[in-house]
A protein has these predicted regions:
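Short glycine-rich or small-residue beta-strand-to-loop segments that form or flank ligand, phosphate
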Residues: 82-88, 226-229, 405, 532
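Glycine-rich phosphate-binding loop plus the immediately following alpha-helix
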Residues: 153-183, 321-344, 349-358, 427
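Phosphate-binding and adjacent anionic-ligand microenvironments
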Residues: 287, 291-293, 314-316, 334-519, ...
């Protein structure tokens, strides 16, 4: 691509959006290069990028072009193509959703769109419930406010496969961003009936499916749990509080500053429940209210973070791994106790999620399926079970990045489901005088202590992209040890190991049941390092983990 020529073409043609036109005129040479050095990547996760002017940005033109490519793909593969659309609270999410709807309508693709912002799992659900050909969710999940994205689902409600993404990308690449995109007015589409709002019955059906995930099976528990909840200025407020209240959890305090949708995320610039800064305000509320449980969902409400009180009365944040294995153990224990465990039960987790999950699953007679990073691969496996007539065999799926799913009603992680099941689990143990931290200690005593940590390193711009590629190649060198732990084996998933799709992921198996995984993020300009350390206790594990991190960071030079 001739960057200068493309920039000038945008100056001449990108006039419909005043903000884009104005920004183009302010760009210096360095910013022009970053905005135009490539087209925004379209993959299994759809689009994700910084909002702004240029081919490497999220704007009405890149969204419209992607929508045109998807429309062309749908028309080739479906006799009567249709799409379900949703959007979150991010800056321009509603605008991008309506632009996409207008493009689909102009191409004869029937559009069903949520009338208000909704969690991402409701798009997966609506796609399945309404039997649409595809689903689109405008979101950038837990990224900072400058980002937005465009997530695509297949007819099964699962994020598109690698093959489908390649076919859609091929259609997109045929298009000129200004000359080849058909558009239509959103409001005119609603009036004509080409664009229809998704009815409330679909939302109610979604909430009912979440409620059906309960594993109490008639057992009585004390539901008077003091809960502090934060939707982190996203989409979770109504569905999470509605579900909890309908199931008897009414003692809920919502973090006021983070209650209403706001794509600027004024109280937490990085609205990710994985990081303590995003949970800080909720922790303050929990202390003031003397809450039993703190819950927070990310802006598109597919991740859940929690905090509980320890014996000293101080609040502790639990990791996604810890919450996931607690939920897995609780669900399995309840199913076994009540005779509700299905035939040939299955648990699905990602390769970067703690291996203790597999030990717990084995204890209860579950088969574990390990998949690549990304909940779409968990959804894909649920789909395979469904095709075999065995959807009920699926018991639980989770990933270390705070994503959980207890049923097959959607094919993506569900923060509404996660929030509800965490509350139920908390109440169940509290009724017996057991805290979640007590239960966690019990699991460590049974299966051995394991520390799992995640370290992220940011690399912005075109230079950063090249740097990440260089670092990944450096890690493929003949590394003998990390932190004094010998490398027993290197698993390079770029070769498609264990029947999994090829992926830019390296996993070093170290001695003493330790490991380190290195991969670039699929949604942000970051390299991620996942470390797992088995040891006698937390102190010993933290010491080893620190040494492994030091050695790993040497390869960033």
């Amino acid at each position: 691509m001739d960057i200068k020529k493309e920039y000038e073409r945008w100056l001449a043609n990108a006039t419909a959006a005043a903000d884009v036109a104005a920004e183009l005129k302010t760009l210096d040479d360095a910013k022009i290069e970053d905005a135009f050095y490539r087209d925004l990547d379209f993959g299994t996760g759809g689009l994700r990028g910084v909002i702004g002017a240029g081919t490497n940005r999220m704007n009405i033109y890149t969204v419209a072009k992607a929508s045109q490519g998807l429309a062309d793909y749908l028309k080739k593969n479906f006799a009567e193509p249709s799409v379900a659309i949703g959007y979150d609270s991010r800056i321009k999410s509603d605008v991008f959703a309506k632009v996409a709807a207008g493009v689909f309508a102009a191409n004869g693709v029937k559009v069903s769109i949520w009338p208000v912002l909704m969690p991402v799992p409701t798009v997966s659900f609506a796609t399945r419930y309404l039997h649409t050909s595809a689903g689109v969710m405008v979101t950038a999940s837990h990224n900072p406010s400058k980002y937005n994205g465009y997530k695509v689902y297949g007819a099964d409600g699962c994020q598109i496969t690698t093959e489908a993404a390649a076919e859609i990308l091929a259609e997109i690449e045929k298009l000129d961003i200004f000359a080849d995109v058909k558009t239509s007015d959103f409001e005119a589409g609603v009036t004509s009936g080409n664009i229809q709002y998704i009815p409330d019955e679909v939302y109610t059906a979604f909430v009912n499916e979440v409620k059906n995930q309960s594993v109490l099976f008639g057992e009585e528990v004390n539901k008077d749990v003091a809960i502090v909840y934060s939707p982190l200025n996203g989409t979770g407020l109504k569905p999470v509080t509605r579900t909890l209240k309908e199931m008897g959890y009414t003692n809920i305090t919502v973090v006021k500053e983070q209650e209403q949708p706001d794509g600027n995320f004024p109280t937490c610039p990085y609205p990710n429940p994985e990081i303590k800064e995003a949970m800080a305000l909720g922790m303050e509320y929990a202390k003031k209210c003397n809450a039993d449980l703190l819950l927070a969902t990310d802006p598109d409400c597919d991740r859940v973070g929690i905090a509980v009180k320890n014996k000293a009365g101080k609040y502790e944040l639990l990791t996604g791994n810890q919450t996931g294995m607690l939920l897995l153990d609780y669900i399995c224990c309840q199913r076994v106790k009540h005779g509700k465990m299905p035939t040939d039960p299955v648990m699905i987790k990602t390769i970067v999620t703690m291996d203790m999950g597999e030990q717990i699953a084995t204890h209860y007679g579950l088969r574990t399926i390990n998949v690549l990073t990304g909940f779409k691969f968990i959804g894909e496996q649920i789909g395979k079970l469904e095709k075999q007539g065995r959807a009920d065999s699926y018991v639980f799926g989770f990933e270390e990045s705070y994503g959980y799913l207890t049923g097959s009603y959607v094919r993506d992680k569900d923060g509404v489901d996660g929030a509800y099941m965490i509350c139920e689990m908390f109440s169940y143990y509290a009724t017996k005088g057991i805290s979640l931290l007590d239960k966690l200690d019990e699991l460590y005593k049974t299966y051995g202590y394991c520390l799992n940590t995640l370290h992220s390193y940011e690399f912005d711009g075109s230079a950063g992209f090249a740097k990440m590629q260089s670092i990944m190649q450096a890690f493929r060198g003949n590394i003998k040890a990390f932190g004094g732990k010998k490398v027993v084996k290197l698993l390079d998933y770029a070769y498609g190991l264990d029947g999994l799709p090829k992926s830019e992921v390296l996993k070093f198996l170290l001695e003493d049941n330790c490991s380190i995984v290195v991969r670039p993020s699929g949604t942000e300009p970051k390299l991620k390092i996942y470390i797992s350390v088995s040891a006698e206790n937390r102190e010993a594990a933290e010491k080893v983990e620190c040494e492994i991190v030091k050695d790993a960071e040497k390869w960033f030079a």
